[in-house]
């Protein structure tokens, strides 16, 4: 009689559910330990609650979008590609759609549908999901033999750590996986926030808080090298602490070592108009308001909350009449609108980041199996590993792919 291998998975997020279900399908007896009462808490908030579950691209393009340890992921992504992910969800009855930037979402636009699909997949595969908190690994002779939790002790032939990072602690990502990994002797690369809002000492940000800019162009410039480290077109938001929104979160992942006032944001408020056409547009607006104060001539050109900050930077008296604005003053205004700058002071705390940069050192993990090189039977998957990507579905794909690979290999007798 064949005895199935016992596998314990710590964490029922994207990586954990995929790892557990895969191990069960390969014949293992699987227990998934989750400290929250509901699985997939972090999946629920991804993509603004819509769940950007993958990026519909080839493997090389995918790796190019992983600035931290992308090469480590070749085996995992090749074994379970973005195309495989899409086919997987479609086969489970979850219809998907591909939007701008090859971002894949459920047709329903509901992240709960992704969570429910993964939960059902794990349960139907034979996984037992228990609500408990893992406190320590049980190690013996260089191998892991179980997990000691608050309520019970679970013995196993293999253990997969899928606890996530340290961002969004309300979802359960409180850094538990790093503690367990350190207990096993693993090195933890220092943790930093990634996909996180910027802080700014510019007082005008607070004046503009709540202002959402759409269809603007953004450049993040390193003042030391004078080069742009990021540029894009899209949406951003001013807040009481600085800047947030889709482009800002994406930009943050391109800055590995944030230093106060080293980086500056350059915002083109009118990217659809070149300098000449913008100047002509402003001329027309001033003609329509020729006898009015210049401060009252921007209602058609700019959102209300940014008018005063622009006027202050321009330096022209607010009560100067439009018909007395000089060509030089008009050109100076165009320059401000084409390059509205905001100094960047730093990142918001890691607890507010979408993902955690840093984690278990990849050189201590076998990339072909996700097994620890230090402790036999110990595996890692998902955000706990020191791999993070740009926004656009890449980070969830890392979770699916590493979870799949870890689950498969953990089940082998």
Named regions from a protein language model:
Residues 8-10, 33, 134, 154-169, ...:
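Short hydrophobic core segments
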Residues 3-5, 149-158, 231-232:
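Core beta-strand elements of the Rossmann-like FAD/NAD(P) dinucleotide-binding domain
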Residues 24-48:
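Glycine-rich FAD pyrophosphate-binding loop
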Residues 50-98:
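Glycine-rich active-site loop/strand segments that organize a redox cofactor
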Residues 130-143:
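A conserved short coil-to-beta-strand element within the FAD-binding core of flavoproteins
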Residues 5-32, 406-411:
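N-terminal Rossmann-like FAD-binding beta1-loop-alpha1 element of flavoenzymes
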Residues 37-45, 59-60, 95, 187-190, ...:
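An anion/pyrophosphate-binding glycine-rich loop and adjacent beta-alpha core
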Residues 130-133, 308-388:
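A glycine-rich dinucleotide-binding beta-alpha-beta segment and adjacent secondary-structure elements
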């Amino acid at each position: 009689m064949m005895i199935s291998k016992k596998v314990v998975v710590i964490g029922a997020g994207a990586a954990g559910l995929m790892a557990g279900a895969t191990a069960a399908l390969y014949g293992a007896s699987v227990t998934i330990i989750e400290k929250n009462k509901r699985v997939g808490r972090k999946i629920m908030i991804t993509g603004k609650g819509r769940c950007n579950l993958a990026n519909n691209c080839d493997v090389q393009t995918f790796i190019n979008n992983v600035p931290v340890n992308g090469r480590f992921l070749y085996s995992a992504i090749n074994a379970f590609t973005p195309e495989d992910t899409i086919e997987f969800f479609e086969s489970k009855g979850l219809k998907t759609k591909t939007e701008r930037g090859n971002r894949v979402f459920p047709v329903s636009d509901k992240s709960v549908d992704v969570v429910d699909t993964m939960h059902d997949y794990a349960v139907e595969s034979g996984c037992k999901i228990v609500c408990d908190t893992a406190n320590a690994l049980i190690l013996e002779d260089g191998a892991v033999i179980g997990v000691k939790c608050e309520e019970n002790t679970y013995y196993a032939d293999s253990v997969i750590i899928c606890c996530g990072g340290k961002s969004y602690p309300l979802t359960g990502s409180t850094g538990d996986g790093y503690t367990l990994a350190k207990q096993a002797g693993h090195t933890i690369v220092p943790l930093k926030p990634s996909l996180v809002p910027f802080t700014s000492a510019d007082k005008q940000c607070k004046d503009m808080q709540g202002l959402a800019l759409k269809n603007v162009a953004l450049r993040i410039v390193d003042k030391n090298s004078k080069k742009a480290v990021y540029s894009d077109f899209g949406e951003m938001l001013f807040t009481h602490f600085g800047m947030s929104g889709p482009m800002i979160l994406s930009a943050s992942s391109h800055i590995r070592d944030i230093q106060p006032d080293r980086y500056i944001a350059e915002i083109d408020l009118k990217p659809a108009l070149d300098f000449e056409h913008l100047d002509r547009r402003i001329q027309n607006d001033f003609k329509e308001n020729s006898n009015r104060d210049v401060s009252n001539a921007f209602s058609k050109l700019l959102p209300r909350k940014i008018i005063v900050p622009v006027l202050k930077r321009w330096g022209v008296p607010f009560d100067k009449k439009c018909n007395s604005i000089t060509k030089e003053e008009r050109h100076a205004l165009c320059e401000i609108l084409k390059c509205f700058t905001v100094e960047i002071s730093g990142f918001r705390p890691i607890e507010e980041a979408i993902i955690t940069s840093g984690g278990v050192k990849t050189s201590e993990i076998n990339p072909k199996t996700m097994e620890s090189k230090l402790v036999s039977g110990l595996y890692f998957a998902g955000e706990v590993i020191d791999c993070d990507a740009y926004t656009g579905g890449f980070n969830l794909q890392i979770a699916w792919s590493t979870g799949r690979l870890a689950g498969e290999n953990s089940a082998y007798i």
